Amino acid sequence: MTSTTTEHTTARKSVWKHGIAATIVAAAVTTGLAYIAMRAGVSFVDPAKPEIPIPLLGFAQLTFVFSLIGVGLAAIFARKARRPRSTFIRTTLVLLALSIVPDFVEIPNFSPDFAPATAWTLAGLHVVAAAIVIPVLASRLAEER
C-alpha cells in the first residue's frame, strides 16, 4: 500500500481580474450618472473657461485610470503589506477624501461662480466609483499575510 500526501496550498485570489471588472463597472456607472446629472441641469462647465466643459467620456477615462491605480495598489499590498486588506482600505479611503477636497476648496477659489451642485455631483461621483471598486478589491485581499 502506498500513502499519498496532499499539500494544502491557499490559492491567491485574483485581484487583477476582479479589479478590472470593477473598474469597468465603475467607469460605466459614473459616466451614466454624469449624463443623468447633465440632463438634470448640473453644469460641468467652468464659468471662467466656458469653452472647455468636462466631456462626458472624461468621467469614464478618469474613473478608469484612477481605479486601475487602486487595482495596482491592491496588488502591491497583497504581496508586501502585513495586513493587506486593512492597509488597502485605509489607504484608499484617505485617497478618496483627498480626491474630494479640490471639488470644494480649489475649484471654487479659482472660479467663484462654480455651481455648488457641480461640486457636490463631482464629489458624489468619486464616492460612487469608490463604493464599487474598493469593496471588490478589499474582498480579494487577505486579512493577514
Name the predicted role of every residue range.
Residues 18-27, 31, 127-145:
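Membrane-water interface at the C-terminal end of transmembrane alpha helices
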Residues 16-24, 60-64, 88-93, 119-124:
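Hydrophobic alpha-helical transmembrane segments
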Residues 26-38, 67-75, 100, 104, ...:
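Transmembrane alpha-helical segments of multi-pass membrane transport proteins and ion-pumping complexes
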Residues 75, 79-97:
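Internal alpha-helical transmembrane segments of multi-pass membrane proteins
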Residues 51-66:
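A loop-to-helix transmembrane entry motif
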Residues 28-55:
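Hydrophobic transmembrane helix segments
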Residues 1-15:
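Short, Lys/Arg-rich, polar N-terminal cytosolic tail immediately upstream
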Residues 102-120:
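Membrane-helix boundary connector in multi-pass membrane proteins
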